[in-house]
UniProtKB/Swiss-Prot annotation:
NAD(+) binds at D30, E31, E32, Y33, D34, S79, M80, E106, R129, E163, K301. Keywords: DNA damage, DNA repair, DNA replication, Ligase, Magnesium, Manganese, Metal-binding, NAD, Zinc. This is DNA ligase. Its EC number is 6.5.1.2. HAMAP family: DNA_ligase_A. The gene is ligA. The lineage of its organism: Bacteria, Pseudomonadati, Campylobacterota, Epsilonproteobacteria, Campylobacterales. Residues 569-647 form the BRCT domain. Zn(2+) binds at C395, C398, C411, C416. DNA ligase that catalyzes the formation of phosphodiester linkages between 5'-phosphoryl and 3'-hydroxyl groups in double-stranded DNA using NAD as a coenzyme and as the energy source for the reaction. It is essential for DNA replication and repair of damaged DNA. It comes from Campylobacter concisus (strain 13826). The active site is at K108. CDD domains: BRCT_DNA_ligase_like, LIGANc. The keyword Nucleotide-binding does not apply. GO terms for molecular function: DNA binding; DNA ligase (NAD+) activity; metal ion binding.
């Protein structure tokens, strides 16, 4: 994976995570998310100095939905590390010397995590996981769930955590009722449960027959030694019990996993794996946490489910860069509770690689999403009705002639609706100008109503124009206009990123802003290629982009007035040093990298004889080995903090 591919993968994962956690409308299967997530993780482990501040590997869950108030957990609500094979399980057991410990194994239910706070025996608050520190206060909705006790016999302060799910049968009945009312069916039980829990109207939640299954605790002073004892205590308070709860040794884990997997379909609720956690609570605390996961527990995920269906047609989608992406239209098939009608085909080279044709029978896999992946083509089932999938010559949106670059087929018309809308959505996104409220649906509506036709038009939106739109109230209009106004004066690097020049991501934009400031548009090919990390392709892309769009960029810049942050170097023992960061630290690496650079240090991604020292955290890998081999000084965080004070 290249740096550019990594940055794109981070953007994709964040979009998928937002759709999954915040909107309860997944854009990708669990398998696709997991695969891309682990590719990103592998890149970060190999390139720790390049980790994005927005990387999903450093974040737990999602955000807070508009309409709900924020509430904080007393104890942080962590995410879980996923593993997919016995080899990965063995590696996890060896980390921290867990092999001789006793474990608890239980189902990983596929729903929405919820934290229940009881005080003096009364349910006082119910909070979604959110980002792990704060979530949504859904207390009123939780009180409508029959399996959530309103009061318990224990009078101490305690956080009881679990999964909100919906039984498969109840999910089918719910969709039947929605069909009778002319409403669209819900995609799968997981999203039905999450969406039901986060309804603004508690009466809707009450009708959904949700189920709360506890799996742990947060704040508590029970004084118990084992997780199994804690869960017995919780279930004795009147909470739901599951019949699969095993206390096991290492050698028994595989058999337990296979047993649970074999019973997957017979379970009344959706499962997507088996949770394995150290039983001894004191040992759990000794093992500790990474920035995202507890080290004492892991989710051994089930394999994705595969089914056979037929590819009826291929639809074409156009992105903001003009790339035309083929999407397979399928004979509808139900996979593990979700009705699937489409599958990604990635690009036209992938179609040729698969050798797939219209009307072919294909194998698809998914896990928790409606857009699966095609894994195979059953060519032996062809009956003569198959048709070749032609590479398109004209844009399906604007009709202009397409440029065929091999892997990618592109629309070059800068006025193409798909490109314009996509570019505005990108510009307004969190990593760019961060214009809250200017998402996909709103941008499409504004474009259709003729209120915007380019990025600059965002800043010409008027109160009266927005008030005339369906669904827009005074508060919503003011919030949007305030967010647009607040985007003025944004950092130059964010502004450059928001313009969407091909091959110029966040890192390259920061380099341009810090090197050239407001004169970045005038940088020559020689100046660009002299920058660290800038290649010929990036330089040519930027020069071509600047030449074609100069007038529009300058006009937009006059409105936004992007700011250039001047970094003042603080002289201390770190000034002029070349530093490599490796391993897991107590703070995000981007934060430490920025701090080092403010001291005048250079942060490198690889260890060499020119490296002055390596800052090593937990589980440091090959870079630490290389440092020891070359005799490079290795320091920990406490030594780093001391060096900061040496002027």
């Amino acid at each position: 994976m290249t740096k550019q591919e990594y940055e794109k993968a981070v953007d994709t994962l964040n979009a998928w995570a937002k759709a999954y956690y915040d909107e309860d409308e997944p854009l990708a299967s669990d398998e696709e998310y997991d695969a891309l997530y682990h590719a990103v993780l592998a890149f970060e482990q190999a390139n720790p100095s390049e980790i994005s501040l927005f990387s999903p590997t450093k974040r737990v869950g999602g955000g807070v939905k508009e309409g709900f108030s924020k509430a904080s957990h007393i104890k942080r609500m962590w995410s879980m590390e996923d593993i997919f094979s016995l080899g990965e399980l063995d590696a996890w057991l060896k980390r921290g010397e867990k092999e001789n410990l006793t474990f608890v194994a239980e189902p990983k239910f596929d729903g929405a995590s919820l934290n229940l706070l009881y005080e003096n025996g009364v349910l006082v608050r119910a909070i979604t996981r959110g980002d792990g520190v704060t979530g949504e206060d859904v207390t009123q909705n939780a009180r409508t769930i029959s399996s959530v006790p309103k009061s318990i016999s224990y009078k101490g302060l305690i956080e009881i955590r679990g999964e909100v799910v919906i039984r498969k049968d109840d999910f089918e009945l719910l969709n039947m009722e929605r069909a009778k009312e002319g409403e669209a069916p819900l995609s799968n039980p997981r999203n039905a449960a999450a969406g039901s829990l986060r309804q603004l109207d508690s009466a809707v939640t009450a009708k959904r027959k949700l189920l709360f299954i506890p799996w742990g605790v947060g704040e508590q002073s029970l004084g118990l030694k084992d997780h199994s004892e804690v869960m017995k205590f919780v279930r004795d308070l009147g909470f739901e019990r599951d019949d699969f709860f095993k206390i096991l040794k290492k050698d028994e884990l595989e058999a337990a996993y296979n047993e649970l997997l074999a019973n997957r379909d017979s379970k009344s609720v959706m499962m997507d794996g088996m949770v394995i956690r150290v039983n001894d609570l004191a040992r759990c605390e000794q093992l500790g946490y990474t920035v995202k996961f507890p080290k004492f527990m892991v989710a051994f995920k089930f394999p994705a489910i595969e089914k056979v269906t037929r590819l009826k047609d291929v639809a074409l989608q156009v992105g903001r860069s003009g790339v035309v992406t083929p999407v397979g239209v399928l004979d509808e098939v139900n996979i593990d509770g979700a009705n699937v009608k489409s599958a990604t085909l990635h690009n036209f080279d992938e179609i040729e690689r698969l050798g797939v044709m219209k009307n072919d029978y294909i194998g698809i896999i998914r896990s928790g999403d409606v857009i699966p992946k095609i894994t195979k083509v059953f060519k032996d089932r062809r009956d003569g009705s198959e048709q070749a999938i032609e590479r398109p010559k004209f844009c399906p949106v604007c009709g202009s002639h397409l440029l065929d670059e091999g892997v990618f087929v592109k629309c070059q018309n800068l006025s193409c609706r798909a490109r314009v809308v996509g570019s505005i959505i990108h510009y307004a996104s969190k990593k760019c100008l961060n214009i809250d409220g200017l998402g996909d649906a709103i941008v499409n509506l504004l474009f259709d109503k003729g209120l915007i036709a380019c990025i600059k038009d965002i800043y010409g939106l008027k109160f009266d124009d927005l008030m005339s739109l369906e669904g827009f109230k005074e508060k919503k209009v003011n919030n949007l206009l305030n967010a647009i106004e607040a985007s003025k004066g944004a950092e130059l690097s964010r502004f450059i990123t928001g313009l969407g020049c091909e091959h110029i991501g966040e890192v390259a934009a920061k380099k341009l802003a810090s090197s050239f400031g407001l004169d970045w548009l005038d940088a020559s090919f020689e100046e660009l290629t002299a920058l660290e990390g800038f290649g010929v392709e990036m330089a040519n892309s930027l020069i071509d982009f600047a030449e074609v769009n100069r007038d529009e960029i300058l006009a937009l810049s006059q409105i936004v007035q992007p700011s250039v942050t001047q970094v003042q170097s603080i002289s201390n023992a770190l000034s002029g040093k070349t530093v490599v960061i490796t391993g897991t630290l107590s703070r995000p690496r981007d934060e430490i990298k920025a701090e080092l650079e403010s001291f005048g240090a250079k942060v490198s991604g690889s260890v060499s004889k020119k490296t002055d020292f390596v800052l090593a955290g937990e589980e440091a890998g090959s870079k630490l080995d290389k440092a020891n081999e070359l005799g490079v000084l290795v320091i920990d965080e406490s030594e780093y903090e001391r060096l900061k004070l040496e002027v």
